[in-house]
């Protein structure tokens, strides 16, 4: 019996030592697993986003709960409750700490999201999406260009009106330059690739049958060379055109952005400036056209060669030669012919004593045909002015043909 008691006591000691070994190994395994899990969640918290952190916290909670259940099962099987009770306590405290840290991070993320959404709402509510008379502290075009009282708002109003006048001024200058360059091109033929019809280099061509002079026709230039190989003067003109177009386009787009602020003060400033500047520079165009037409008539009268080849319509027709009239008359009576010759001599002497108007007095009043031609030209000029006033005067259009003649 004593041997059996000793054997049973030895078995109990072996079992207790085995259970202690198993418990200690389980505890060390649980602690290692918890430490590795905590390290994993910390690294994931630092590298992952807010949504990934929330999913990692859920995974950690499930892992900790499964490990706690495993440790509780091992402690009940081994019977060593005291040694295993400390392990769930530490794991619970670690889980509580991690949960609190995760809740803090989630709170920070929610606060950040709420603050950003609040800023977005403030910005969206600060922008105008419809016409409004409110202009106070609303920036237009630039960050510091805003008005907080009526005086500053009126100053911005005048700024946009002046910008509209500058835009129309650039268009008017471009139109004047195009007319001037076109007139100079046609008058002097310096910058044109077209050879003049009256050029001396072309020579003179005669028709032997009809015995009259045929002027040389201009040569047709190469279109590609005119477009891609311009002269230096044409290139200089293109640079001026590019500068004017760039500046005017920039101003009109800035005015468009000002109207997109939906502030009525700025919208009416742009509309008022464009309307007034259009009327003003349209009047300037009409005055310039009238002035150029008068200058053209004066230049034509000064360069007119006189009667016989009159081009201005202000020189009288030459009187018929009395000698030629006397020679054309036919008669059989010799005395009658002599009398006519005497009369013609008397007429010649009287004609020599009289002053020739074209030689001493210059241009007289226009004859009936000249008056009719002048009236026709004036009617054409009035019709052209009416057409220009009724339609939009595009600055890119070439001037009328009446400005291309000398």
From Swiss-Prot:
<feature type="topological domain" description="Cytoplasmic">
    <location>
        <begin position="272"/>
        <end position="406"/>
    </location>
</feature>
<feature type="transmembrane region" description="Helical">
    <location>
        <begin position="251"/>
        <end position="271"/>
    </location>
</feature>
<keyword id="KW-0186">Copper</keyword>
<feature type="compositionally biased region" description="Polar residues">
    <location>
        <begin position="349"/>
        <end position="375"/>
    </location>
</feature>
<feature type="modified residue" description="Phosphoserine">
    <location>
        <position position="369"/>
    </location>
</feature>
<keyword id="KW-1017">Isopeptide bond</keyword>
<feature type="modified residue" description="Phosphoserine">
    <location>
        <position position="344"/>
    </location>
</feature>
<feature type="topological domain" description="Cytoplasmic">
    <location>
        <begin position="1"/>
        <end position="152"/>
    </location>
</feature>
<feature type="modified residue" description="Phosphothreonine">
    <location>
        <position position="356"/>
    </location>
</feature>
<dbReference type="GO" id="GO:0005634">
    <property type="term" value="C:nucleus"/>
</dbReference>
<protein>
    <recommendedName>
        <fullName>Copper transport protein CTR1</fullName>
    </recommendedName>
</protein>
<feature type="repeat" description="1">
    <location>
        <begin position="9"/>
        <end position="27"/>
    </location>
</feature>
<keyword id="KW-0597">Phosphoprotein</keyword>
<dbReference type="GO" id="GO:0005886">
    <property type="term" value="C:plasma membrane"/>
</dbReference>
<dbReference type="Pfam" id="PF04145">
    <property type="entry name" value="Ctr"/>
</dbReference>
<feature type="short sequence motif" description="REP-III">
    <location>
        <begin position="304"/>
        <end position="315"/>
    </location>
</feature>
<feature type="repeat" description="2">
    <location>
        <begin position="28"/>
        <end position="46"/>
    </location>
</feature>
<feature type="cross-link" description="Glycyl lysine isopeptide (Lys-Gly) (interchain with G-Cter in ubiquitin)">
    <location>
        <position position="345"/>
    </location>
</feature>
<keyword id="KW-1003">Cell membrane</keyword>
<keyword id="KW-1133">Transmembrane helix</keyword>
<keyword id="KW-0472">Membrane</keyword>
<feature type="region of interest" description="Disordered">
    <location>
        <begin position="318"/>
        <end position="406"/>
    </location>
</feature>
<dbReference type="GO" id="GO:0016020">
    <property type="term" value="C:membrane"/>
</dbReference>
<dbReference type="GO" id="GO:0005737">
    <property type="term" value="C:cytoplasm"/>
</dbReference>
<keyword id="KW-0406">Ion transport</keyword>
<feature type="compositionally biased region" description="Polar residues">
    <location>
        <begin position="384"/>
        <end position="395"/>
    </location>
</feature>
<feature type="transmembrane region" description="Helical">
    <location>
        <begin position="153"/>
        <end position="173"/>
    </location>
</feature>
<feature type="repeat" description="3">
    <location>
        <begin position="47"/>
        <end position="65"/>
    </location>
</feature>
<comment type="function">
    <text>High-affinity copper transporter of plasma membrane that mediates copper uptake under low copper conditions. Copper transport through the high affinity system requiring CTRl supplies the iron transport multicopper ferroxidase FET3 with copper, which in turn is required for ferrous iron uptake. The energy for translocation is unlikely to be directly derived from ATP hydrolysis and the exact mechanism driving the transmembrane transport of copper has still to be determined.</text>
</comment>
<feature type="region of interest" description="Disordered">
    <location>
        <begin position="71"/>
        <end position="117"/>
    </location>
</feature>
<feature type="region of interest" description="3 X 19 AA tandem repeats of S-M-X-M-X-A-M-S-S-A-S-K-T-X-X-S-X-M-X">
    <location>
        <begin position="9"/>
        <end position="65"/>
    </location>
</feature>
<dbReference type="GO" id="GO:0015677">
    <property type="term" value="P:copper ion import"/>
</dbReference>
<feature type="modified residue" description="Phosphoserine">
    <location>
        <position position="349"/>
    </location>
</feature>
<dbReference type="InterPro" id="IPR007274">
    <property type="entry name" value="Cop_transporter"/>
</dbReference>
<keyword id="KW-0677">Repeat</keyword>
<keyword id="KW-0832">Ubl conjugation</keyword>
<dbReference type="GO" id="GO:0005375">
    <property type="term" value="F:copper ion transmembrane transporter activity"/>
</dbReference>
<keyword id="KW-0187">Copper transport</keyword>
<feature type="topological domain" description="Extracellular">
    <location>
        <begin position="174"/>
        <end position="250"/>
    </location>
</feature>
<keyword id="KW-0812">Transmembrane</keyword>
<comment type="subunit">
    <text>Homooligomer.</text>
</comment>
<keyword id="KW-0813">Transport</keyword>
């Amino acid at each position: 019996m004593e041997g059996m008691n000793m054997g049973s006591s030895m078995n109990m000691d072996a079992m207790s030592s085995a259970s202690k070994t198993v418990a200690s190994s389980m505890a060390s395994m649980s602690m290692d697993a918890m430490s590795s899990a905590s390290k994993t969640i910390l690294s994931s918290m630092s590298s992952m986003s807010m949504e990934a952190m929330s999913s990692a916290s859920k995974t950690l909670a499930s892992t900790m709960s499964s490990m706690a259940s495993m440790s509780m099962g091992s402690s009940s099987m081994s019977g060593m409750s005291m040694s295993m009770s400390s392990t769930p306590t530490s794991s619970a405290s670690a889980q509580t700490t991690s949960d609190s840290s995760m809740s803090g991070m989630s709170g920070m993320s929610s606060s950040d999201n709420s603050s950003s959404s609040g800023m977005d709402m403030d910005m969206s509510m600060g922008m105008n999406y419809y016409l409004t008379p409110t202009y106070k502290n609303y920036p237009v075009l630039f960050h510091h260009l805003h008005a907080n009282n009526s005086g500053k708002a009126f100053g911005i109003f005048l700024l946009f009106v002046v910008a509209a006048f500058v835009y129309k001024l650039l268009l008017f200058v471009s139109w004047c330059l195009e007319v001037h360059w076109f007139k100079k091109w046609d008058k002097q033929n310096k910058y044109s690739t077209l050879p003049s019809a009256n050029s001396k280099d072309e020579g003179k061509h005669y028709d032997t049958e009809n015995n009259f002079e045929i002027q040389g026709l201009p040569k047709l230039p190469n279109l590609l060379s005119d477009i891609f190989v311009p002269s230096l003067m044409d290139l200089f003109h293109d640079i001026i055109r590019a500068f004017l177009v760039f500046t005017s386009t920039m101003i009109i787009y800035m005015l468009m952005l000002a109207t997109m602020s939906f502030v009525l003060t700025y919208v009416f400033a742009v509309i008022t400036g464009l309307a007034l500047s259009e009327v003003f520079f349209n009047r300037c165009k009409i005055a310039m056209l009238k002035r150029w037409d008068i200058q053209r008539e004066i230049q034509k009268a000064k360069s007119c060669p006189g009667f016989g080849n009159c081009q201005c319509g202000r020189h009288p027709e030459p009187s018929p030669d009395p000698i030629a009239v006397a020679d054309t008359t036919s008669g059989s009576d010799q005395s009658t012919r002599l009398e006519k010759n005497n009369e013609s001599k008397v007429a010649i002497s009287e004609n020599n004593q009289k002053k020739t108007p074209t030689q001493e007095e210059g241009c007289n009043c226009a004859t009936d045909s000249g008056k009719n031609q002048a009236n026709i030209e004036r009617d054409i000029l009035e019709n052209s002015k009416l057409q220009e006033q009724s339609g939009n005067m595009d600055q890119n259009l070439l001037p009328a043909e009446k400005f291309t003649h000398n």
